[in-house]
Amino acid sequence: METKHIILLAIVAIIIALPLIIYAGKGEEEGYFGGSDDQGCEVVEELGYKPWFHPIWEPPSGEIESLLFALQAAIGAIIIGYYIGYYNAKRQVAA
């Protein structure tokens, strides 16, 4: 194996191991994985905000909500992929 490949494998191993070492067992209780959505929600609730309107339809469960989100992401990815492929093919035909 060439030296270049060994260096690349070492870098990949470091990239994989480093987050596991830094994590050090801190969990959600300590707020390690708290996101900006959670922090924003807490601030809004502290202010006593009342929503102006309610959603027309709410998914019956979190799984269905996740399914709808995944479908939306998949449809968007298909549309973006189609246009990228279309313009690449158009450019190749023109060349």
Curated annotation (Swiss-Prot):
One of its GO terms (biological process) is cobalamin biosynthetic process. Pathway: Cofactor biosynthesis; adenosylcobalamin biosynthesis. One of its GO terms (molecular function) is cobalt ion transmembrane transporter activity. The keyword Transferase does not apply. It is found in: Cell membrane. It is a multi-pass membrane protein. The keyword Methyltransferase does not apply. Its main location: membrane. The chain crosses the membrane at residues 5-25, 67-87. One of its GO terms (cellular component) is plasma membrane. InterPro entries: CbiN. Pfam families: CbiN. HAMAP family: CbiN. Part of the energy-coupling factor (ECF) transporter complex CbiMNOQ involved in cobalt import. Forms an energy-coupling factor (ECF) transporter complex composed of an ATP-binding protein (A component, CbiO), a transmembrane protein (T component, CbiQ) and 2 possible substrate-capture proteins (S components, CbiM and CbiN) of unknown stoichimetry. NCBIfam families: cbiN, PRK02898.1. PANTHER family: COBALT TRANSPORT PROTEIN CBIN. Belongs to the CbiN family. This is Cobalt transport protein CbiN.
